[in-house]
Amino acid sequence: MKIMITGSSGFVGSHLKERWKAKGHQIVEWDRKEGKELKDIVIDGDTNYVIHLAAWADVRASIERPNDYWENNVVTTTNIQRICHEKGIQLFYASSSCVHAWSKSPYGISKKVNEETAFPGQVGLRFTTVYGEGARDTMMIGKLVRNEANYATNHVRDFIHVSDVMDVIEMLMNKPVHMLEPAYDVGTGIGNRVDYLANDICGYDLPVKEGQSYEALDNTADITLLRDMKWEPKVNIVDYLREKTTVLHQ
């Protein structure tokens, strides 16, 4: 298969790229790190799938730069949706669990608009909080593993491992288009308070801060649609953290 990945050098994109190359698929990369801007995107007509993951994803930064988030998350995605629709190419694009509280931030608004402008058959992937090797240094799970966290919050977060995310994407790609929903929550369906993971599971003694008003207090996914397809997550965040942080406390 010929698969285009935007954001192919990013966290999820790089994992997908390596998995699919190993399976013998032809991967077309489109990434700013390769000098390719989304506004200039060219999608070949013989492409089987476009996996659109390139986006600005920092909720806090979106408060400070709303116009930039509109340009990078809305204008570019709307264009990709149009091109894929006109060429008959199946599109899966990164939405976010933020759509459930979309009015709290420009980032959430941008993802809500992405879902509203999608054409029939195009699928939004409402990722919760993805973790694993290669995640941004600012992400909490990585900080806990590296013993770099200075505080925890009272947020409830649905942490999903990147390998489980990839399994969901592949499962949906293998479904007939007429059987797909417009969007799917992509998480484990299990929420954990961040301070519980940090202090009770990892054994730290971090101060606890209140969550910011522009962030959802709880992003636990409703994975009923995924479970209806017999999918269940394979990696549990509590087990993952216990394994990764045990050495820190020996």
Language model regions located:
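Adenosine-cofactor binding site in Rossmann-like domains, unifying the SAM/SAH pocket
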Residues: 26-42
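NAD(P)H-binding glycine-rich loop region in Rossmannoid oxidoreductase-like domains
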Residues: 41-72
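A recurrent short beta-strand within the Rossmann-like NAD(P)-dependent oxidoreductase core
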Residues: 129-130, 151-157, 169, 176-189, ...
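NAD(P)-dependent short-chain dehydrogenase/reductase
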Residues: 104-108, 112, 116-171, 200-201
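N-terminal Rossmann NAD(P)H-binding glycine-rich loop of SDR-like oxidoreductase domains
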Residues: 3-23
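Conserved Rossmann-fold NAD(P)-dependent oxidoreductase catalytic core, especially the SDR/UDP-sugar
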Residues: 52, 78-108, 123
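C-terminal "lid/loop" region of Rossmann-like NAD(P)-dependent oxidoreductases
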Residues: 181-185, 192-199, 203-223
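Amphipathic terminal alpha-helices
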Residues: 224, 236-250
